Each structure stands twice: as structure tokens, then as C-alpha cells.
UniProtKB/Swiss-Prot annotation:
This is Mycothiol acetyltransferase. NCBIfam families: mycothiol_MshD (TIGR03448). Its EC number is 2.3.1.189. It comes from Jonesia denitrificans (strain ATCC 14870 / DSM 20603 / BCRC 15368 / CIP 55.134 / JCM 11481 / NBRC 15587 / NCTC 10816 / Prevot 55134). The lineage of its organism: Bacteria, Bacillati, Actinomycetota, Actinomycetes, Micrococcales. HAMAP family: MshD (MF_01698).
Length: 314
């Protein structure tokens, strides 16, 4: 049996530790076909404001197991991965440590499994965790026919569309995002700091973020679409598409979906993909009409029995 020696720390990781975690994630991404950690935990690695605890197993100077637990007031989200001689044992040890830390911070552990990771899924099932939420990744191939059909998306009457201005539009974008995603546990909480962190990422460009406003109120954003183009990727992500409650049902969402498709085509991407909640029937219907189909799933687990002294989420 392999000895698993864990260390845990809050606050930003050192450059070397963060680099080692990213290397672990890259290796496991190549093996699994899906990144085992999502975007936010990677942003948190060096963020001094992130309210998270980093849990690491280190062998020979390399990080061979990593977990990140959100210990904020609304927290409990856990993402983890490992590349050990006994991977199941390492995953179990990371989960044990996360559960103990969660008790100290009075949060409920809610682990994520991204894509198909049988080792993590098996450990969670053995501990009594059950699926509570599912994110779907939808994808569609782009073709010349799309270029001809969507050559000029038409802005709905009464609205105008323009490129995002990072200086003057930040407040309005965050307000629109909060309204459009008031029901969403992560996206609806986007802050100025979160937006700033994403705008510092190498993939960010204002050319990939468009906003829709009423003709008479050019500063009030009621819809927006944001594309994310990772370096060396053949697929571009429809990163966020949001429409405020008051603007829904007026064709804004359909227009923004068509705009995203045309933008991807014009920049030479053969594929467009996006994330959507499995129970968001309105969004699923819209994307299905535009040719998107499920490609992978990401499942969030919880313990309904309130084991380890935790209460289930209300």
C-alpha cells in the first residue's frame, strides 16, 4: 500500500506549487480526455482572495494528488485529481482530508466529477455520495452551410449590439449577469474581481464579448455573449450567454447564439461547444434547435444523509 502524505494550506500557492498542480492537471487531462479541474480552481491557485483550501500529496517533489475545497460561506465545492501508484487510495485520502476541513469551516462537501473518472466516482459511491447536479457539454460542428444561413444575424427590433467596453461596461455587465443567472450557484455570483481575473487570462479579448442594449439606453446591458478561445484548441467555447429576465422572449438569446456561431466561423473554428445545466430546459431547447448535441457531462455530488456531521443543503 502506498503511503499518502498530505499537506493542506489556504491562501495562494507558490509559483512552483501552482505550476506542479497545473502539470498534474495536464497529465490527467491527456489520460482522461477531460480536464479533472474546472476553470475556477485553476484561477484560485494563485489568487490571494480565493477562500479555498489546497490539499496536496507530494512524491519526489512533484504534486501527485491535489484537491481544492471552497470554504466560503456558500462553499463546499470540491474538485480533486490524482496520479499515484494507487490512485483510488490517494483519492480517498484527499476526500478524507477535505471532509475534515469542511467540518472546521461548517460547509457541506460537494465533489465534482468531470467527464468519466471511474476512480473518483467509485470512491464517492463507497462514501455514500449521490449525484445532485449535472452540467452538460454540448457541441456542434460548423460548416459552409452555417456561413450561408447565418451570414448576417439580425438584431431584434428595439435593440442594438456592440462590442464590450472593459472600462465603461463592467458594472452593467455584472448587473445583467446577476439578473440572468440569479438561479445559478456559481455564475450568478460573478464579481468585479472575478471579471478582472478572467480579463487577465491569455484567452481574453474584447472582440469575443458582445453586448445587447435597448436602442434608447445604450449603457444598460440586457444580453451578452462571450466566447473563449483556448490556445491550440480546434473548438471555441460559447463561454457565457446571458439574457436578463425582462429581455427574454424577444429573440435576444437566439440572436446571440447566431452571433456566436458566425464569429466562430469567421475565425476559422470547425467546432463550437458550451456548458449548460441539464435541467435548464429553455436553454437546452434553444441550443438543440441550433444543432448542438451532448458531448460530455460533469456531475456534482452530495451526501443526502448528512454524514460526518454535515447537514444536507436546503
Amino acid at each position: 500500500m502506498t503511503t499518502v502524505l498530505l499537506t493542506s494550506t489556504s491562501g495562494p500557492l507558490s509559483d512552483d506549487a501552482a505550476r506542479s498542480v497545473r502539470e498534474l492537471v495536464a497529465l490527467e487531462t491527456e489520460r482522461l480526455g477531460v480536464p479533472p479541474l474546472s476553470e475556477q480552481p485553476l484561477l484560485n491557485l494563485r489568487d490571494p482572495r480565493a477562500r479555498v483550501v489546497h490539499i496536496m500529496d507530494t512524491q519526489g517533489g512533484d504534486v501527485t494528488g491535489y484537491a481544492q475545497l471552497d470554504v466560503s460561506r456558500e462553499g463546499g465545492s470540491l474538485e480533486l485529481t490524482a496520479r499515484c501508484a494507487d490512485r483510488t487510495q490517494c483519492v480517498g485520502a484527499l476526500l478524507n482530508e477535505a471532509e475534515l476541513i469542511a467540518q472546521d469551516h461548517d460547509v457541506v462537501v460537494r465533489p465534482w466529477v468531470h467527464g468519466d473518472d471511474p476512480d473518483v466516482t467509485r470512491v464517492l459511491a463507497q462514501r455514500g455520495y449521490v449525484p445532485a447536479r449535472t452540467l452538460l457539454v454540448l457541441s456542434r460542428d460548423l460548416s459552409l452551410a452555417d456561413t450561408q444561413a447565418l451570414a448576417t444575424p439580425v438584431v431584434p427590433e428595439g435593440f442594438v449590439c456592440r462590442r464590450f467596453d472593459p472600462i465603461s461596461d463592467a458594472d452593467s455587465l455584472l448587473a445583467a449577469n446577476s439578473d440572468a443567472f440569479s438561479w445559478h450557484p456559481e455564475q450568478g455570483r460573478l464579481t468585479h474581481h472575478d471579471l478582472s481575473m478572467r480579463m487577465k487570462e491569455p484567452w481574453f479579448t474584447p472582440d469575443h464579448l458582445h453586448v445587447v442594449t435597448p436602442v434608447s439606453e445604450s449603457a444598460r446591458i440586457v444580453g451578452f455573449v462571450w466566447l473563449k478561445a483556448e490556445p491550440h484548441s480546434r473548438s471555441i467555447e460559447l463561454y457565457v450567454l446571458g439574457v436578463t429576465e425582462a429581455a427574454q422572449g424577444q429573440g435576444v438569446g437566439r440572436f446571440l447564439t447566431e452571433l456566436a456561431t458566425v464569429t466562430a466561423l469567421n475565425q476559422g473554428y470547425p467546432r463550437l461547444h458550451l456548458y449548460v445545466e441539464a435541467d435548464n430546459t429553455r436553454a437546452l431547447a434553444l441550443y438543440t434547435q441550433h444543432g448542438f448535441a451532448p458531448m460530455e457531462r460533469h456531475v456534482n455530488f452530495t451526501q443526502p444523509t448528512g454524514e460526518l456531521g454535515h447537514e444536507p443543503p436546503s
